[in-house]
Amino acid sequence: VKKKFIFIIVIILSIISLTGCWDSIELNQREIVTAVGIDKGDEKSNIIVTFQSIIPERASTPLRPASEKSNIHVVSVTAKSITDSLVKYHKRTSKTPEFQHNRIYVIGEDLAREGVNSFIDGIFRTYEFRSRGWILLCKGKASDILHKRVEATAISADYIGNLINISNHVATVPTETLHTFLMKLSSKTTSPVVTQIEIEAPKEGNAADIGYNGCGVFKKDKLVGWLTMNETRGLLWITNQIGKGVLLSGYPGTASENISEQIVRSKVKINPKITNGKIMISLDIWEEGEIRENDKGVYINSPESIKALEDGFATEIKREVKESLQKIQKEYKTDIVGFGSKIHKKFPSQWKNIEAKWDEVFPEIEVEVNVEVKLRSTGKIINSITP
């Protein structure tokens, strides 16, 4: 009797612990949001929010051919706020939107210049949106980017996401997630900088494509201007985000202009100093690389020739950094490089005196740029194959 009683208790407990499926959503009832674009609306205080999503039931598998209908669904709604746009989006689709896989947020230029605080709050506060998704800018409309189909994949969000992943390895543009963007908006010293993407003009025989082209510079929550690709790389040197790109330099006393170096590793130290009562920044950059191309028969088989190349690459890095600083400090006058936070940390008492007027002080900060390059290898051969 005792064993029978225990058996009944176990059965009852097992039944109680079973989970039900009363709130399950079948795959054919879902659409997976992959990207969100936000533009300025036609009327004041309106925004246009574009949602790009995948409809799984229309995707092809080895056992099922693709549907004749596209598996990409793009919807644009005009709304007063981000929350309002979600309500209107639900009215425009017969399926349940899933936001867990959203990778991309694209902001149009007109809206970014007016300020992003109002809708960034709505995105970050709403549970549906991922804070780890990348935030990007475009000079035109974000809706155009998300409606664009690219040759490599029908899903422009996947294509853009892959571009950003690759950029981390080739030192071309900064990567800013929604989370890091919000942290900089909340900072008292550092403003955000965001990668710019664009629809590239079609080349002969090919469709138009999507690519990145420098970055947008913010002052607080407003876009104030753009950096070119070269100026952006100067910024990446300063902020220690350079990754593994390629440097080109000439060789003194020769016609060579295209000796190529693969960046292997680098590090940057931003060191605030006080000289004669004046705050300045010492920017120390160390870079290690390998020769990857030598096109003009330059002999690099001696310590002197290696040193000359190292000096040439150091000069090129310094040029990129100074060009970027000139644009950032003198034209845009906004601290996107983190000098203020470094001064605050090292000289807290002096920082109190300049914090309220940092926007006026930052453009006048003197920056001393020191670069050291170390070439650790010339590749598989020493000299050029061209005599």
Where are these regions (language model features)?
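Membrane-proximal alpha-helical signals and transmembrane carboxylates
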Residues: K2-P387
